[in-house]
Each structure stands twice: as C-alpha cells, then as structure tokens.
Amino acid sequence: MNTILVTTSRGLDELLKQEVLTLCPDAQIKQGPGTIQFEGSKEDAYKLCLWSRLANRVIWVLASGKAGDAEALYNTAMGIDWQMQMDSRHTLSVQFIGTNFAIKNTQFGAVRVKDAIVDSFVEQGLPRPSVERKTPDISVYARLHRDNVILGIDLAGASLHQRAYRQETGDAPLKEHIASAMLMRSGWTENTDAPLVDLMCGSGTIAIEAAYIARNIAPGIKRSYWGFTKWLGHEATLWDSLLEDAISVQKPSCGGGIYAGDFSRKMVAIAKANADFAGVFNDISFSQQDATKSSPPVATPGYVVSNPPYGERLGELTSLIPLFSDWGKRFKEAWKGWHVSLLSSNRDLLRVLKLRATKDYAMNNGKLECRLANYVLDEQNTVQFSEDAGNHEFANRLKKNLKRMKGWVKSANTNCYRIYDADLPDYNVAVDRYGDWLVVQEYAPPKTVSEDKARKRLQEVLLHLPAVTGVSPKNIALKVRAQQKGSKQYEKINQSGEMMEVFENGARFLVNLTDYLDTGLFLDHRNTRQKVKALSQGKDVLNLFSYTGSVSVFAAMGGAKSVTTVDMSNTYLDWAKKNVALNKLSGPHAFIQADCTTWLGTHKGKYDLIFIDPPSFSNSKRMQNTWDVQRDHVKMLTDAKACLKEQGTIIFSNNKRGFKLDETAVTALGLQVENITKETIPEDFARKGKIHQCWVLRS
C-alpha cells in the first residue's frame, strides 16, 4: 500500500470523495481543499487515472518532509531514491504547488526539486536527466503546505480533464471534469434515462461527458500520454488488464436522449466533430438554435444543463442582460416541469432570469469562482414574470425625462442628446442618445456603495433601457467613467475603429461610441458651439485643445475668414479634418499638431476669436510640463491675450469641478470678464447645471 494523493478543482472535493469511494471502496480518506488522500494500491491509482471524471491529478506519493526553506526542500527531495523511479535517460518536469515565507514562488521551488533529482544522479556517476516541459517521461509533483512538502510521481502526466477528444474549442471552453461535476450536481446522473439538453453547447463538452456517463465509457480511455508509461514502478500488465475491462463494460449507444444546441453554426460544427472523435456522435442530437426561443425536444421533462456566457468583460453585459431576461421568460413559457442547472461566475446575471434556485454549488471553472445554480421549473417558478417598466424606479424616471424632453428634442435639430444624468442616486449613470444608439456611462460609485449593489443597479439600467427607449440591446455601448488622470483621459478602451455619422444644428459629425471614453462630440457644449458660430463671421478663429474639431466646423459655417485648429493628438486632428471634409468646408483651414500650452507661448499669429476648452489636468509624455487648469489658466490666458487682435474675444471653458477663475488677474490683462455658463448649458444638461463653466473675455 502507498499514499495516493488525488487533486481536483475547488468545490469538487465532496464529489471526488464519493467517486473515490465508488472506485476504491476500502479507502480511508483524508479530505482537504481540492484534494483527497488515502492509502491504496497501484491498481487503485490506475483505476482513478482511467475512471475518474472529476480528478485533475493522481499522485503516487514518494515522500513527505520538511521544506521550511530552500535547503530543507532540497534535502527532502534528495532523500528519495530517484534511480528507483526513473532512468537517467528519461526526461522530467517538476510541477510545484504552494509557497511559504522562504519559498516565495513556485518556479523557484520547482528548480530546487529538479536540482535535487539531477544531483542525485550525478552523485552516482550517472548522466544528468534533461528537462522536458510539455510531455516529459517522468512528471514529478511537489505540493508545499507551510513548512512541509509532499513529493511524488504524477501518474496522469497531464491534467486528467484532458480527455483527448476535443479537437477544437470556442473562446471560453468548459473543462471536462467541470462538465461532469455539473451533470452530477444537476441530478441527471441519478436518472440517465431522462432527456438531457444543453442549450448553449459550445464545443459540446457537457453533451459528450453525458454520453460517456450514459454509456459507462471510461473518461481516460482515449488518452495516449500518461505520466506512468516510463516510470520504473509501472506495471504494464495490470494497466492493460484495466484497459480491457474498461472496454468490456462500455454500453451500446444510448439512443439519442442527449441534445446539444448553440446559436453559432460554427460551434455546432465543432461540437459535432468533437463528439465524432469521442465516439459518441450517434448518442447526441445537435441543432443550431437560439436558446431564448427554444422548446423542449421531447414531451417528457428532463434536465437542462448549460454553461452560458459569464459577462466577465464589461461590454458583454449590454447584450447578456436582455439575453438572460428573455431566456428566463422562455424557460417559464416552454420548459415547465424541467430541471435547469446553469454555471456562472456572475450571480447577478443569473438573477436576471427571475427564477428561484432550489440549490447552488460552488465550483471553480479554471481561475473563475463559479456557482452552479439548480432550478426546478415547477408551478411556483413558472408564474409568468412581466416586469412593467412603469413600476420600476429607473424606468419611471427615464420615461418622465423623455416625456418632458419630447418637445425640445423636436426643435433641438440634433440626434445626439442626454436623456438621463444620474437623476436618481441609486442609478449613478449618464445615458446619451446618438441616433439609434445609446451610450451608458457608469460613474464610479462612492465608497459608501458596495460593488455588488452598484453592479446590480447597472444591470437594472441595461435591462430597462431597450424597453423604454426602443433601442436594440445590441446598440448600447457601456463605459465606466471614473476620475481620469493624465494621459488616461484620452486612452483607447477598444479597437473597433467604427465611426457613425450624427448631426447637430446643420452640421454633420463622425463619432466613435466604443473605442474611447468620450465619443468625439462633447454634447454639453452644443450651445457654446452656436456661440462660436455667431461670433465667427469674417473673423480669424483659433481653436485650441480642439479635440475632433466640432468648434472649428461651426466657426467655418459661421463665415470665419480662417480657422486654425490645434491639438496635441494626431488622431484627433485627423478626425477633425474628416469632420471639416464631411461638411464640405473649403477654408482656409490650418491643422497644427502641438502642445497648446507651449505652442501658444511662442506663436506670433493674431486672431479675432480664440476658443479654449482645456483638460482639467494632463501629464502627457508629449508635454514639456504637467498641466493643471486651476494652477495654469492665468498663464494660458496671458499667452492667448498676446495672440488676440484689438477688440478680439476669447471664449474660455473647462469642466473642472470647483474651478474658480482668477478674475482679478484676468482683468489685469486688460480683458473684460463675462460669465456665460448659464446660457451655454443645453436643456438636456440643465438638470445638473454644473457640467462646465464658460466665460467670454473681451479685449
């Protein structure tokens, strides 16, 4: 008898214990987080390699000992007679799990164990074994816990979840042992004659594992690589006998009581290919289908077991929330009497189903902490859920806003405007409409609001927006707006490069709703742009910190003699050129790539009208110094005054909260100061009123 250590994913410990006791009835088990340990025979270890649907590794323990520091670890490893385990011609790898105060990373621990093994051969005058990381002849396993280490031979060689039947996968494949655990926790494995359906099958893992279970196919039967094949302790005759037994107990085809579907034809094709390679193609009925419109394939209720998308990436929520909402409604309409089991790392998405779970289980899918939620679609759970948007606080406020704005929207001559701006403290978002699109900007919640609550509120917003506005969920862009610092204020957050055309007061503009935090058009400056247009007739106009040039467009449309557009970003200057071209404005136009804070101080040109809308703060690498609008605005206006013609005008604006114009210093420059903030705040931003401040400064 020898100590055998079996590992699995967190959350599967109890299931693994039951499985080990089924395969090795006499085992006296010691259970730990993600591990099972017992005294067993080589036959027990081989059975687990071949038959365990839940284990990752089966370790034949060689020794356990002190590992309080690197020297102790080395000595414990040196205490093993490695010449009894492997030949010097064999390749090896060391997998090291755990850290302690002295051994701070697993790579260092693995190297010390490897050094001990190699040195043990060298001391005997034998050649040094070489390292092979992918498919070594001998895979050594080391597990460190506090100051003790367990060392052994990994009989699996590679994780047992790799059944060797998956030829292709999707973007987020489900591990095979997790699929088996889902089937066990769902209750289906106790009633395998019942129909089983996976409505989001991906590469087919759940359905294939179900077919293996129904037909009593050993999960390791197709594996060709094992960690024991070259091990000197391997008993080939015993292993071959177990393989023969496994083949003899396989059941014939289960007759197609397993169903797998996916919205993607490509994934259905991949699932079919994997099932064919696994030898269970005829046991599974495949179909391309939309889960939100699905119906049971048979009249007899059974089990739905699926691994839906989790929404780990922020932008996915806009499509997943309505998907889960529709899916929940479909379950209630069409799947009465069925058992449903869904795995997710996002409990809030599961709540969108509006189903009451009877049980849920923790299990890690890779590094993601997930829950398997079990539902019974009985009478209590299938009462039709129809959430009236008018009865929801956010939806009710949004409807109220849209009703109040209806007349203004008709006369505003634009298809870009704000419809909600954190009107309710619990729903801390801004919602802007751009034609047939909505942009949702989630403000970072205050520290007094928990992340869970903020996430739940955001999901409610995304759920109700399509119903109230009539905008498709696919046309909702989601962004998180926290306080931006330095160069991050214009950083890319996506790479789509997709532009759409919008209009405002007779002008057309290109916006990008997904790639940046801002879209390319500051909606709160709609009135300010009209002010510039009204003052531009026959004037030489300078637009500083020009962004995408919308002010330059209106200056030209207002009859400006010339327009000079200055920005530090070539990307935004190119965008500005496109906006000017889109409106067929002939110029003359000058586009200058420069740091406005230094360019203005050395520029010799003179202008009738200067528009300045700087960032609150910047420390871009392209700038010689940092910029702070509160600290530096007088210097900026001093330089601007030097470029201003007699009887010229500066329009100065910024968005810094709490900003205070140094009127004394500005007046001393010979400029008359007029605060025009109130008239530059558009109707759709009037509820807040503090989106920006704006002044006219006249010489």
From Swiss-Prot:
Entry keyword rRNA processing:
yes
Question: For the THUMP domain, which residue ranges apply?
Answer: 44-155
Q: Which InterPro entries match?
A: 23SrRNA_methyltr_KL, DNA_methylase_N6_adenine_CS, RlmKL-like_Mtase, RlmL_1st, SAM-dep_methyl-trfase, SAM-dependent_MTases_sf, THUMP_dom
Task: Tell me which EC number(s) this protein carries.
Answer: 2.1.1.173, 2.1.1.264
Catalyzed reactions: guanosine(2445) in 23S rRNA + S-adenosyl-L-methionine = N(2)-methylguanosine(2445) in 23S rRNA + S-adenosyl-L-homocysteine + H(+); guanosine(2069) in 23S rRNA + S-adenosyl-L-methionine = N(2)-methylguanosine(2069) in 23S rRNA + S-adenosyl-L-homocysteine + H(+)
NCBIfam families this protein is in? PRK11783.1
PANTHER family documented for this protein: RIBOSOMAL RNA LARGE SUBUNIT METHYLTRANSFERASE K/L (PTHR47313), RIBOSOMAL RNA LARGE SUBUNIT METHYLTRANSFERASE K_L (PTHR47313:SF1)
Instruction: Report the protein name in the record.
Output: Ribosomal RNA large subunit methyltransferase K/L
> Which keywords fit this entry according to its UniProt record?
Cytoplasm, Methyltransferase, RNA-binding, rRNA processing, S-adenosyl-L-methionine, Transferase
What is one cellular component GO term in this UniProt entry?
A: cytoplasm
Please state which protein family the record places this protein in. Answer: Belongs to the methyltransferase superfamily. RlmKL family.
**Which cysteine residues pair off into disulfide bonds?**
none
Name the enzyme group at the top EC level.
transferase
**GO MF, one example:** 23S rRNA (guanine(2445)-N(2))-methyltransferase activity
What function is annotated for this protein?
Specifically methylates the guanine in position 2445 (m2G2445) and the guanine in position 2069 (m7G2069) of 23S rRNA.
